[in-house]
Amino acid sequence: KDYKECAKKFIESHYAFDSESVLFKPTFTKEVIFRNSKDMALSYFIGGNIEEDHGFALKPWEKISIDELNILEENKLSIAMGILKLKPVNSDKITSVAFTFVFTETNSSLKIKVHHSSPL
């Protein structure tokens, strides 16, 4: 499969970039902190036009689990907040990440409007 096309489809189906403004603060960013466009999000996930991007989605993750999941539904928004535990392949080092997702309904599906995640 073409990983670039898969990543584009993932972003289009999970993030609201095509219908409204999105705020995106990925987990492992230091130089360009926010990725508030589809092209910048794509660069974060598969590498591209931002030097620090090495492709979060291309890294071989063995396991990703969620702890302390909190969910809030108000008006037309749904919000999820918790901790992700990321375990790479061939490593015992687990990275804990605090995350917040704000979802909005677009064309009868939920999509991410705000994504913030930071290592703990």
Q: Predicted segments — roles?
A:
Residues K8, V22, S43, H54, ...:
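Short non-domain terminal segments
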Residues H14, H54, H115-H116:
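Histidine (H) residue identity feature
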